[in-house]
């Protein structure tokens, strides 16, 4: 790998070819330090849901209906009630309206199949069951086809406010509600098409960074107030207040600056960008795709 082809992700030099490897399946692997690693019952439950969701994804069956346990419901209630208090103060209007329209409450864990049916009627998006964090190409291929991958397992009960990996609380309370917005849905679909069409690893990284600072950690200006729409922020009781604190550098969303900015997913995000609207974000992505000459139009 020569200097010209070297790119940096998460502060490390990586081979750009790893960005465009063929689609693959997720793996069930709890990292060292995972709260549920030593809990045999939790691991067994994760294994069962992993196998079920993988089968439904590969066979195109849609999200399975899950009979959640009382412990999983307790964790959902504790985490979602804390988040809802913060959402009412800091989440974007579009997010809050969509959350209400989808009937998401802090009392019962919603069934993703039912939400998927509602989304299809609104924006032609649907939810794809994901057994775990999917590889780049698998994930982007799903959203290119108007499907958003979502997990259906719940984080470990010892840390209801924390998860080292995307779980249902992150996906359902972070990613799913904005899918009710047409501009947001079209934005996601275009990201998926562009990322799966290009064979240039640097371009894939550009689209990942664009997604990170919008879909995952995006802020939006609403009548002069900075509100949150990024899933990574909205699903974390720590990130919500931190994102609006004086410790974070917040500037208007400028695409060239965004795609040149690295990030570390293991740390609180101290660099964020603010958009004026989802329509603006969609236009910025369209211009980026054309500038990079990715043949998706």
Regions found by a protein language model. Give the residues of each.
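The feature captures two recurrent sequence modes
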Residues: 1-179, 258, 270-297
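A contiguous, surface-oriented mixed alpha/beta subdomain in the mid-to-C-terminal portion of proteins
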Residues: 153-283
């Amino acid at each position: 790998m020569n200097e010209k082809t070297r790119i940096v992700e998460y502060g490390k030099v990586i081979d750009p070819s790893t960005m465009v490897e063929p689609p693959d399946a997720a793996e069930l692997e709890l990292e060292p330090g995972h709260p549920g690693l030593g809990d045999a019952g939790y691991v067994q439950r994760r294994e069962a849901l992993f196998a079920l969701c993988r089968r439904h994804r590969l066979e195109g069956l849609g999200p399975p209906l899950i009979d959640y346990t009382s412990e999983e419901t307790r964790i959902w209630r504790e985490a979602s009630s804390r988040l809802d208090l913060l959402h009412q103060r800091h989440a974007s209007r579009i997010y809050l309206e969509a959350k209400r329209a989808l009937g998401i409450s802090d009392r019962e864990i919603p069934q993703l199949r039912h939400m998927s049916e509602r989304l299809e009627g609104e924006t032609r998006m649907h939810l794809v069951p994901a057994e775990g964090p999917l590889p780049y190409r698998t994930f982007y291929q799903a959203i290119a086809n108007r499907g958003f991958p979502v997990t259906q397992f719940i984080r470990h009960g010892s840390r209801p406010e924390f998860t080292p990996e995307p779980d249902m609380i992150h996906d359902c309370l972070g990613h799913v509600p904005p899918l009710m917005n047409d501009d947001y849905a079209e934005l996601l679909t275009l990201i998926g098409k562009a990322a799966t069409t290009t064979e240039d690893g640097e371009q894939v990284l550009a689209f990942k960074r664009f997604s990170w600072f919008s879909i995952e950690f995006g802020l939006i200006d609403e009548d002069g107030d900075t509100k949150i729409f990024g899933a990574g922020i909205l699903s974390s009781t720590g990130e919500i207040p931190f994102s609006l604190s004086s410790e974070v550098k917040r500037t208007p969303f400028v695409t060239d600056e965004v795609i040149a900015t690295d990030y570390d997913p293991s740390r609180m995000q101290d660099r964020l960008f603010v958009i004026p609207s989802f329509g603006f974000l969609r236009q910025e992505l369209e211009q980026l795709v054309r500038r990079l000459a990715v043949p998706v139009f």
